Every structure is written in structure tokens, then in C-alpha cells.
């Protein structure tokens, strides 16, 4: 009975790994496509007509070395996680338990992103929306929590498979 349960848990871990792999690949693709704009932000997009008095502050934030470094590091970490997820998928496909490292690294990077955005995103008011930045932060945190679920489920099922060994 335990062997059947273990196989079932590994199959579930494999499925959640695949979901995370697809999400990570899509995220990496959008990060790479957007990297040019992050490394060389177009000042003409940051107009006072759209962003009000916060336009200059937003451009300076977008053009800061911290924002650029964070974007490049994010692409590198995403590539690393994607490679690790592919390796984990191969092992799980064979019914072999895999390390939880890519899932923990994914969660670490999600939390780092949330902290970074909370600390360094300027508070802005856009055409009367005083809580605009707060609203975007809440939506962003919610989306990041959703994207974290496959990693969390993978970890849970890998632990369950270990206990069935």
C-alpha cells in the first residue's frame, strides 16, 4: 500500500512541477522580452499628464541601478530555477523523488520580489487615485501568492512521498 501511495504522491508532485515549469517559462519569456525596456527606460513614457507630479520620481526609480540589477538577477535566477525544474521533472517522470531546492528557491525569489516592491516602489498618486500604488501592491502580492501554489504543492507531495518510503 505504501508503494502505491508514494507513486501517487510523486505523480502529484510531477503534475504540480509541470504547472510551475510552464508558469516559470512564461514568466521568463516575458522577463526577457521586457528586459530591454527595463535596462533602457523611455523617459517620454513618464509624462506628468499620466503620472502627475510623480512622473520624475517614477522615471528615476525605473532608471535606477537597483531596478536594473534586480531585473538582470531575476532573469538569471529564473533561468536557474527553470533548469532545476526540468531536471526535477525528469526524475519525477521516472518515479524518483527529487530535491526541493527549485521550489524553495522559487518561493524565496517570490518573497524577495514582494519585499523589494514594498520597500522601493515609490508612493504615487495618478489622476486622483491616491491609493493606486497600494492597490497595485495588493493585486501583485495576490498574483504572486497564486503563482507560489504549485511550488508549495510540489513540496507538500514530495514530503508525503518521503514519509511513505
Show where each model-derived region lies:
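Cytosolic juxtamembrane helix and N-cap/initiation of the first transmembrane helix
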Residues: 1-41, 157-165
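Short amphipathic alpha-helical segments that mediate assembly, nucleic-acid/protein binding
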Residues: 3-6, 55, 79, 101, ...
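Membrane-interface helix-boundary signature
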Residues: 6-16, 20, 60-70, 92-102, ...
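Alpha-helical membrane-associated segments of multi-pass integral membrane proteins
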Residues: 14, 24, 112-160
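Perimembrane helix-loop junctions in membrane proteins
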Residues: 31-45, 85-98, 120-127, 154-165
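Interfacial non-cytosolic loop connecting adjacent transmembrane helices
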Residues: 41-69, 116-142
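Generic alpha-helical transmembrane segments
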Residues: 68-84, 109, 144-148
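Loop-to-transmembrane helix junctions at the membrane interface
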Residues: 80-113, 117
